[in-house]
Structure formats: structure tokens, C-alpha cells
Amino acid sequence: MSVSTAKRSLDVVSPGSLAEFEGSKSRHDEIENEHRRTGTRDGEDSEQPKKKGSKTSKKQDLDPETKQKRTAQNRAAQRAFRERKERKMKELEKKVQSLESIQQQNEVEATFLRDQLITLVNELKKYRPETRNDSKVLEYLARRDPNLHFSKNNVNHSNSEPIDTPNDDIQENVKQKMNFTFQYPLDNDNDNDNSKNVGKQLPSPNDPSHSAPMPINQTQKKLSDATDSSSATLDSLSNSNDVLNNTPNSSTSMDWLDNVIYTNRFVSGDDGSNSKTKNLDSNMFSNDFNFENQFDEQVSEFCSKMNQVCGTRQCPIPKKPISALDKEVFASSSILSSNSPALTNTWESHSNITDNTPANVIATDATKYENSFSGFGRLGFDMSANHYVVNDNSTGSTDSTGSTGNKNKKNNNNSDDVLPFISESPFDMNQVTNFFSPGSTGIGNNAASNTNPSLLQSSKEDIPFINANLAFPDDNSTNIQLQPFSESQSQNKFDYDMFFRDSSKEGNNLFGEFLEDDDDDKKAANMSDDESSLIKNQLINEEPELPKQYLQSVPGNESEISQKNGSSLQNADKINNGNDNDNDNDVVPSKEGSLLRCSEIWDRITTHPKYSDIDVDGLCSELMAKAKCSERGVVINAEDVQLALNKHMN
């Protein structure tokens, strides 16, 4: 500070006074000398403590033990620092990985949302004209992600040429989307206009550009075939769905649906007139349908065979195992042959019994099986009408059988007809009326009315199980005796008084009989009053008496025994009534735990350690015989499954 003050003093001094300047100069020199002296003293004072606390002196004072301790502490501190550093770095690496995964998820979500936004914008265009906001959204998405499937050129092209859709067309499109039918329509116009519709084509759902040709006739044929077989519909739908899902460049099903509607809104003919709108099934275009669930477990061929027991969607009629005898019967039966009709006329068995009846064909085993089916539809199934004739006279029955055999050869003119049970000969009512006319014989009146000898002889055998004496009374008031159908019935007489009353005779007065019945009722009422009074006076025991042996063997009052007997009877009645009602209230116990589905059985078979040694075909056939139908499908008892597995191990 002295130097600076001196310099300032020199600067402040005016140059005019030289004397003062010289005096001040001498004083300045003195001040500088003093300052130098004070500086040298301060330096000496600072050097002295440094010499006292020098490092060489401290190092010489430390012991080797303290040195080792300090080095160990330093190493431990350095080790801890390195561990903390590594731990911190690992935490930071984990954070970086989590942030990277979050970033990837965000990118995937952003890409998905962009695609969804593009899809929504495109769908919105179909219901209303395109606006500027739609084009801005598409341009923004194109700038953000240039790898999208559409480009700016397409967007600019769409902006330069906007879609001009009238409001009427939009409303019609919406109505057509809303009003789909769930059944395939019967299109009768296509049968007449097959040649006209060859050129018209529908877009294919499997083609991403919707330009695959497909004639309308083929489409309608496929739709009609699909109504006959539901499996074909499901398979075709599942195949189309798989192709749509696996094709990266394919559009959604709504795009294909819209193209179908726009293409086939009006199918115009050659004359230029518009026909009706084509009705399409919404099931063909629905993505919510579960194609894998086809009412049966499509696990393997094993389950498809097992499901035949209860029937499937493709084959609703259940199939049962057929024995070898049944197979031979079906192979040789006349049902499978078109030249031998099975049904015959039961009312004119004398003229329309086919050649396959037991009376005519008893040759080989095959014809025996055939006869069991050829008799179906006739009276008595597998029996001729002659078997119903009363067999009191064996010779008469054998003769009639032989005569029918000869008559079959004469009158069997319609055996090869398509409808053998319809007779060409007219039905003669005179034969019936004359045959059942009162007081006449069967053969006499038939000869007068009809001269056909074969019909005359068979008239006895037409209805052999009806007694004409009871069914057709005569005018005679006493009795009627008609010619019977068989010799055993010749002695039967008709009691006229059993069915018809004559008021002129004695004892046939209905009013008198009514009065007599009234008197009998009064007597019975009086008798019941007397019996009730006796019961009250304990002169008659109302309970039934027990055997004397029982009374002697069991001591006690008769009243107690009777009371016990009455109570036991009541209990027995209650038990019987309970047994009658048990059938109504029977509940089959549930065995859900012990019943296995086909998929569970197949899992058990495939996981068996000796799976290669199992006879799967034999096991399947045996389980089909033991299968049961339930709400869940085909189920089999677990014990039966285990026994079958043990049985079919090679």
C-alpha cells in the first residue's frame, strides 16, 4: 500500500512546484526502504514454521504397523468405491434396457394406431365423401412413417379427384349392410339365365386387389351346395379366413364386402333392365364366427369316429356297430335291389304277393334274409295272410296254402311294377255286399255276383279273423246262422236277445227293470244301515279275522293284534304307493367325474408309455359300443376306457 500511495502522491503533485517534488522524492525513497525491510522480515517468519513441520520429519516418526493399517484402510475404501460404482452401473444398464423396451412398445403401439387410423379413415370415406381433414390425417401419417403401404402420390391423387358419392347411394349402401339375411335365397332367375350371367364376376376375398375372377353361377352353386352340407360351408369359411389373416397385403373383410355390394347392387341383363338386388349371407363375411368349434372335437380321426355314435353336424343320424349277420342281410336284402319291391298290398294278398314271400321262395340262406325284409309292410310282417286262418282243420289250411301258391303265379302281374301295392283291378263292392248279406252263404252269393274262380276260393280267406255272425245281424228276430269262414265256426250261432230288445215280449220292459233296480238299491241301503248298527254295537268285527293258529301262537288281545294288522296294512299300502311314485321321481346320479370326453381319452392314449403297442382301431370300435351321449358330446366311463386300454395292448 505504501508503494501505491507513493505513486498516487507523485501523480497528484503538480509539475509546477519542483521543490516540493524533490522533497517528496526523498520521502518516497525512505518509504520504499522501510517497505523492503518489513517484507524480508515476514519471509523469514514464514520459513521458520515450514522447517519445523517438514514431511521428512513426519515420515520418520510413523511406525510400520501404522503404515500397514493405513494402507489396508485405503485399499478397503478403494474396493468399496469400486463396488458401489459397479452396482450403480448395473442399475443404470437395467434402466436403459427398460427404457428401450418401453420405446419399442411405444413404437409398436404407434404403428398399430397409425394403421388403425388409416383403416378408420378409409372406412369413413365409404360412408361419406372425403373431406380435407381426412387428407390431412393421411398426409401427416405418410410424413411420420414413409414405410406405410400407401404413398403421398395416392393421397394427392385422392385429393385432386375426390370421391363424389351421392347421398342416396350412401343410404342404400348402409341399408344393404344392415339388412342381410341369414339364409341362402332361392334364386330362380339364375336357372333360366345361366348363359347371360357367365360374364358377370364377383371379387374374391382372398385376392388383395379384389380382382380375382369368379363367375356368379359358380358362387350360387357353391352357396346351394353349402346349404346341403354345413361342413363344406365351415371349411370354406375357415380357409378364406386363414388366407385373409396370413396375407400381409390383403385388405379387411369389410373391403371385400363393400366391393361385393357395389359390384352386385344391380345385376343388369342383356336388355338393360335392372333386376333385384342380390341377397347375401352375412355369415360369409363375419369375422366373429368361431370356425374351429364345429360341434365336435376335431382332435384326431379317433374323435371323429367316436362322435359318429351320437351324430355330428355333418352326419346327424347316429351310427351303431352292425354285426356280420346284419351286413349279410343288408347285402342280400331286396331293399337294396330295385327290381324286387318290398312293399305289397295287404288287402289283396291273393293277387299281389310278390315273388319274395316265404310261400314262393325258400331256396338259399340269402333268400331267407331277403324274406325278412320283403315281408315288411304286409299284414303280420314276414307272414302270409293264410296264417291267420283258424287251424282247427290242418288239412284245410294246407290246401288253402297250396292254392294261394298257385294263384300267386296266375295273378301276379304287377310284381315288377314301381308301386306294387296299388292294384290295377277295380275293387268290386258287390262281392263284399253279397258276401255279408244276411241269411246267405259265402260261396253261393259270390258265385252269383262274380264268376272269377280264384276270387271265389279266396273269399273265405280275405278276413278270417272277423266273426260275421256278430258283426252282421239278420232281420230275423230270434237268431242268425251264417255260413262261417272256416269249418270250426260252423256251429256258432248269434244270440239276438243279447244285443236287441223286443218290448212286446215279457221281461223286456225297460221301465220295469229300472223300478226293480231301484228297489234293489233301497234294500242294499237298508242292509248297510243294519250292518253299521251292528258294528257300532261291537257285535261284528270290522277287521278281518286272523287264523286261529296265529291267535294261539301269539298271546294278547285280539284288538291289539287287529290294530297292529291294520297299521301294517296301511304301511304296506304306503310302501307300495311309494314304489309306484319312485319311477316318477327317479333321478339318475351324476357321474361327471368318472365320464371322459373324447379329447380326454385321446390325451390318455397318446400319453400312454406304450402308445405304439396300442391297437387304436380295435380300441375305437370297442369304445364306440360303450359310448354314451351327453350335453358335452360323446362320453365314456373311465373304468371302461382303462379296461379297453389294457385289453388292446399288443
Swiss-Prot record:
Region (Transcription activation 2): 430-537
Keywords: Activator, Cadmium resistance, Cytoplasm, Disulfide bond, DNA-binding, Nucleus, Oxidation, Phosphoprotein, Repeat, Transcription, Transcription regulation
Ranges spanned by the short sequence motif Bipartite nuclear localization signal, renumbered to the chain: 35-42, 68-75
The keyword Glycosyltransferase is annotated on this UniProt entry: no
Pfam families found in the cross-reference section: bZIP_1, PAP1
Modified residues (Phosphothreonine): 165
UniProt-listed GO biological process terms: cellular response to oxidative stress; positive regulation of transcription by RNA polymerase II; regulation of endoplasmic reticulum unfolded protein response; regulation of transcription by RNA polymerase II; response to arsenic-containing substance; response to cadmium ion; response to heat; response to singlet oxygen
Compositional bias ranges of the Polar residues kind: 150-162, 195-209, 551-570
Reported function: Transcription activator involved in oxidative stress response and redox homeostasis. Regulates the transcription of genes encoding antioxidant enzymes and components of the cellular thiol-reducing pathways, including the thioredoxin system (TRX2, TRR1), the glutaredoxin system (GSH1, GLR1), superoxide dismutase (SOD1, SOD2), glutathione peroxidase (GPX2), and thiol-specific peroxidases (TSA1, AHP1). The induction of some of these genes requires the cooperative action of both, YAP1 and SKN7. Preferentially binds to promoters with the core binding site 5'-TTA[CG]TAA-3'.
Quaternary state and interactors: Interacts independent of oxidation state in the cytoplasm with the karyopherin PSE1/KAP121 (and less strongly with KAP123). The reduced form of YAP1 interacts in the nucleus with the nuclear export protein CRM1, and in the cytoplasm with YBP1 and the peroxiredoxin HYR1/GPX3/ORP1. Interacts with RBG1.
Further details from the record: One of 8 closely related fungi-specific YAP proteins (YAP1 to YAP8), which all seem to be transcription activators of the environmental stress response and metabolism control pathways and to have similar but not identical DNA binding specificities. Present with 1600 molecules/cell in log phase SD medium.
Listed name of the protein: AP-1-like transcription factor YAP1
Species for this entry: Saccharomyces cerevisiae (strain ATCC 204508 / S288c) (Baker's yeast)
The organism's taxonomic lineage, starting at the top: Eukaryota, Fungi, Dikarya, Ascomycota, Saccharomycotina
